[in-house]
């Protein structure tokens, strides 16, 4: 990866002074654009690097957004000494993964109004409760959603994690956790000057399953009925086998 990095870095530096670069103002690349998830997947660390037509005091913000969809927040209560889920709220159009990185504090780069308009920040995401669900204290549910996603490492804010060099080069490491969802991930690089957007570029990362986990996933998606029947039969066989072993062990104890 180091060899590829240096080759791409030389390429980026070579176009830094070209007319093409002057028009685009920012170019970026990833050390890995395809991530394969196998049964022993422990996460991935991807290097993002690039060049920009910068000046002293410029800033770079990197936003990585995974597939969006429905995310459920559940409330647990203790009933008769047992914790059970008593209520739930579904949020739609919610990023299943979100990482926001910057070269310094985001509040020092953009004011609150600009952050809200640009959806930069976990509290500025334009997600909403699924229609038809009545929610009391929605603010608390939204806080619980954020707390859950942060705890599971699916959302993160990484300030001071983008390294700038000579107002022309930048790099940052993107970390995907072991529980990351599959799909297309958008990598948006934003170049700011005096709190105003100067240029941007969008790259992408494809996360997919491989090996036996991919086969199981494909069967579950394409043959859901068959997969359900197989899961039930497997559970019955496991239960029957466990019961048989228990009987033999118990009989041996009695004989002894």
Sequence positions of predicted segments:
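N-terminal edge beta-strand
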Residues: 23-41
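Juxtamembrane interface at the cytosolic side of transmembrane helices
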Residues: 235-256
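A short tyrosine-centered beta-strand micro-motif
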Residues: 183-189
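Bacterial N-terminal signal peptides
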Residues: 8-17
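Short edge beta-strand/loop segments characteristic of extracellular beta-sandwich folds
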Residues: 47-53, 173-175
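Short, aromatic-rich amphipathic segments at membrane interfaces
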Residues: 175, 196-229
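Membrane-proximal low-complexity regions enriched in glycine and acidic/polar residues
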Residues: 78, 82-177, 181
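Bacterial N-terminal signal peptides that target proteins for export
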Residues: 1-8
């Amino acid at each position: 990866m180091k060899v590829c990095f240096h080759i791409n870095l030389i390429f980026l530096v070579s176009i830094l002074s070209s007319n093409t670069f002057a028009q685009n103002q920012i170019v970026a690349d990833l050390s890995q654009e395809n991530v394969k998830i196998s049964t022993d997947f422990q996460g991935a660390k991807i290097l993002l690097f690039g060049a920009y037509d910068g000046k002293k005091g410029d800033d770079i913000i990197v936003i990585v957004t995974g597939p969006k969809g429905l995310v459920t927040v559940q409330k647990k209560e203790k009933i008769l000494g047992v914790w059970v889920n008593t209520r739930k709220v579904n949020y739609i159009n919610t990023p299943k993964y979100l990482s926001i990185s910057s070269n310094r504090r985001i509040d020092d780069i953009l004011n609150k109004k600009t952050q809200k308009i640009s959806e930069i920040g976990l509290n500025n995401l334009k997600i909403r409760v699924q229609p038809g669900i009545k929610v009391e204290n929605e603010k608390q549910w939204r806080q619980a959603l954020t707390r859950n996603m942060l705890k599971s490492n699916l959302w993160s804010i990484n300030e001071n994690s983008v390294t700038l060099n000579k107002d022309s080069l930048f790099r940052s490491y993107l970390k995907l956790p072991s529980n990351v969802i599959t799909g297309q991930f958008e990598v948006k690089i934003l170049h700011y000057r005096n709190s105003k957007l100067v240029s941007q570029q969008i790259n992408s990362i494809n996360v997919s399953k491989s090996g036996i986990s991919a086969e199981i996933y494909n069967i579950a998606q394409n043959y859901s009925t068959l997969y359900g029947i197989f899961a039930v039969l497997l559970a019955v066989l496991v239960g029957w086998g466990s019961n048989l072993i228990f009987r033999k062990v118990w009989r041996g104890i009695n004989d002894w």
